[in-house]
């Protein structure tokens, strides 16, 4: 099952990246119904602009469906609790995908769909590492908890990034590290509470400028917290002079630097599509690298 799981992991990574491309090209409503497109299993003949967005959305659905089949097969053959949880998660992801369309890109649902994709990929990464890497480092429960908390921080930061994307707040601050010349601009904390209104289409965002600034800056401050926390933690891990810790830590460090630089470049270059997609891919790679480090640590004596 090792090779099978790795294939599923790469497929999940592709689904996450293509999902980001779908959001960033405003193709999320390219097909206004679900699971088909205008009532058809493939994109029907429509005007050129709608056709491109519709095909982007449907290819994303086809790829996600293929991943679901892989995960179902994995559950049938492994029968483990983790594979069962993964199978249930994929079913819930399919529902979120449907609601993303039927609820017209309501931000909490869009963010939940993004997080569900990341968690699916993360669980597949953990299973793949479990099949591939036997050697672990015995550490204290305190150190294990500290590294695990770093994983939780990454999860929250990905959620904030999803909130930025789903509320179209990426371009609201054109400078760095300030926002419109202010390090601490005016904030509107209602930006994190968006009730659902059946009469609204949320494509393009409905929040005012101050609310979007709030979302953007919270994501930035979250990035600072993640970088500082992980830099201090990695320095400590490197000082342990354990080869496995150093190798796993270097992967995290590279992914962290890469992701932070992509975030800054996206601000200065006005969010070109390839950099925006790369920023989402970078978040996925950072998550995988941190899960790898967590897996390599064992706080229980065997």
Region roles according to the model:
Residues 22-31, 94-114, 164-175, 212, ...:
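Interfacial helix-loop-helix junctions of multi-pass membrane proteins
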Residues 2-28, 152-164:
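N-terminal signal-anchor transmembrane alpha helix
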Residues 126-143, 288-302:
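A juxtamembrane structural motif centered on a specific transmembrane helix
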Residues 76-84, 140-142, 234-252:
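Membrane-interface helix-loop-helix junctions at transmembrane boundaries of multi-pass membrane enzymes
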Residues 16-17, 89-98, 154-159, 254-264:
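Aromatic-anchored segments of alpha-helical transmembrane domains
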Residues 4-12, 63, 67, 82, ...:
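Hydrophobic alpha-helical transmembrane segments of polytopic
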Residues 54-72, 107-122, 214-232, 276-285:
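Membrane-interface loop-to-helix entry segments
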